[in-house]
Structure formats: C-alpha cells, structure tokens
Amino acid sequence: MKFLVDTHAHTIASTHAYSTLHDYLNVAKEKGIKLFAITDHGPDMADAPHFWHFVNMRVLPRIIDGVGVLRGIEANIKNQQGDIDFFGDYLKQLDIVLAGFHEPVFPPSTAENHTQALINCIESGKVDIISHPGNPAYPIDIERVAQAAAKHNVALEINNSSFLTSRKGSEKSCRAIALAVKEAGGLLVMGSDSHVAFSLGDFDKAVEVIEAVQFPIERLLNRSPEALLCFLSARGHDSLDEYADLV
C-alpha cells in the first residue's frame, strides 16, 4: 500500500532543517503525496521559529497545486505536568498539533516522570499526536501511555527518522508501542519527521514495524487524507472544509 499522507515535516523556519515549503510541494507532487503537515518546532527550542510564524500560518492556502498543506506545530513537552510551549486560542488556529520530548527543553529523567508527562499531555486535550514516543532516551510505561492515548483519541507516532538518522535504538520500543496501541484499540500515525524535503513521505522502516505487529490498517491515520481529516475533525479542528476536494 502506498501512503500519501505525512503528518511531520520541518522547514527552514526550524534552522536545523533545510527545505522550504515550495521544496516540499515539489517533492509532494513528484511522489504523489496528497496531504502533508508543516510542523516546525515550538518556540522553546533554541532554533525554533518565532511565535508569530505559527500565528501567521493563516496566510497559507490549504491546497496548493492540488496538494493539501496542514498548518501545524511540533510543540515541546515542557514538564511533568505535560505543558506545551503553545497555548490558548492560538492552538485553535492550527490544523494539527504534535508534541514530544526534546532534550534542550525537557532533559531526560525517569521513566515514571516521562510517563506522567505524556499522560498529562494526552489528557490536556491540546495535542493530537505524540511525536516519537519510542525515543530510548525517554523510557516510558508503554501500556499506560497507549491506554491513555486510546481513551482520549490521541494518536501515537511511529517516527521513520528514528530508524535512520535520529534516536538510535528506537526499534524495540517502537514495536512495543505499535503492539500496545493495537491491543488498546488506539490510533497510530507514521511520520517521516523530514528535515529535508527529499524524505517527505518516506515510511519504509515505520511500515516494517506496522506490518510486524499486524496493526489494523483502519486505525492507521496515514491510510488516506480522509482518515486523517476525519480524525482531526473529531479532535475539534473546525477549519478543515477547505480540504474537501482531497477526499
């Protein structure tokens, strides 16, 4: 199966990434990708875009040359309370909100602290997807997190870059997460976590994890633009009508 939806990509607005929105659009058209999200790092990261970057995403057309572009963020989980570095009504202006641990903002701690931070973040209702929860630098109680995510309709990400250039040693935990989410009746999403446009929509390693645990395709958000958009609508994002031509 070819997956035509990517929920995790960084532009040069995050200065450790190397591609523009136009670069991503060109690659999306070449690969046949129908919908992707721009999710630059939240403001608490040292090289993140200014807060205004996210506020002003309203100027972006939602469909460009036949490709849907979701206005998003990869926010930083800041503390054990599960707080993130984006807030209030501004969150409602975004189409998709990812959040995860990043060492400059939340230094690795204990498994219990990591677990409680993720559960609190999930329960806050502010976040749609937990990014790279399989990072071995942040061990968690996988079953508790998977159950909380399923209960609150939050997706957990299998991050393809975790098997390539980042977060080495993620394979075991990602497989355990996929299995736990399957058993909890929850949702998974694959993210390329692209920091350069060439890798947009690349999920080869993530697909291996999904297939290894025989994860139900009907609970994988990448299966179609419609699946992701329905999920986001159910999560309370109410500005998605402009994407109707994609489904």
Curated annotation (Swiss-Prot):
Origin species, per record, is Shewanella piezotolerans (strain WP3 / JCM 13877)
- For binding Zn(2+) 1, which residues are annotated in this chain's numbering? H8, H10, E74, D193
Keywords linked to the UniProt accession: Hydrolase, Metal-binding, Zinc
Q: What is this protein called?
A: Probable phosphatase swp_1620
| Recorded GO CC terms | cytosol
Name the PANTHER family on file.
PHOSPHATASE YCDX-RELATED
Intrachain disulfide bonds: none
Name the residues that bind Zn(2+) 3: E74, H102, H132
What's the cofactor?
Answer: Zn(2+)
EC number, UniProt record: 3.1.3.-
Keyword Hydrolase on this protein?
A: yes
